[in-house]
A protein has these predicted regions:
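A short, surface-exposed alpha-helical micro-motif characterized by mixed small hydrophobic
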Residues: 118-120
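Catalytic Walker B motif of ABC-type/P-loop ATPase nucleotide-binding domains
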Residues: 71-72, 77-81
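Conserved ABC ATPase signature
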Residues: 44-48, 52
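ABC ATPase "signature
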Residues: 136-137
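Conserved ABC ATPase "signature" region
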Residues: 23-40
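ABC ATPase nucleotide-binding domains
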Residues: 149-168
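H-loop/switch region of ABC-family ATPase nucleotide-binding domains
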Residues: 112-113
Length: 168
């Protein structure tokens, strides 16, 4: 299917196509600016890079937070690997948008496999192995060599001075 970027984001508007109004346009403008994709709205989604597609999907997620009265509809954002296919600058941009959302009162739940990213940008971390939570707490509480080695079955080192995790 060949949809424009705007149409892909529009699919996230939970009120349905009959409610595409000026309120939607305001929400679209807001998420377009936040995700820095406004210039892509008329472009075919199929022509985007993997990182651009990821940003469009993120914008579609954000627009779901507003109803036709542009009042906040949801207080939680749940994302699975939102930084996949993003270069470092766009990864940080997305993380900073999410941090801003937490300051606005939103709860943000993210599944990440990048341990360093999880350590540096999370307030709380849960490690799940075989469907069970085996460690939960602040990054400083759970990013311990013993815990990480048990979870991953690898030799894991954590450098307290640089706050970097290495595994081999």
């Amino acid at each position: 299917y060949d949809f424009s970027v705007k149409e892909v984001i529009e699919m996230g508007w939970l009120e349905g196509k009959e409610f595409i109004t000026e309120k939607f346009d305001n929400a679209l403008h807001k998420v377009g600016m936040e995700c820095e994709i406004s210039h892509l709205f008329d472009k075919s989604f199929n022509q985007l890079s993997g990182g651009e597609k990821r940003k469009v999907h993120f914008a579609r997620t954000l627009i779901q937070m507003y109803n036709r009265d542009f009042e906040t509809k949801s207080r939680y954002i749940m994302l699975d690997e939102p930084t996949a296919n993003l270069d470092i600058s766009h990864e940080l941009q997305l993380i900073n948008i999410l941090k801003k959302k937490t300051l606005e009162g939103f709860g943000v739940f993210i599944i990440l496999h990048d341990l360093n990213l999880a350590y540096h940008f999370s307030d709380k971390v849960a490690f799940i192995k075989e469907g069970k939570i085996c460690a939960f707490g602040t990054p400083d509480d759970v990013f311990k060599e013993k815990i990480l080695t048990e979870i991953y079955g690898l030799d894991v080192s954590f450098d307290n001075s640089t706050k970097k995790i290495s595994y081999y």
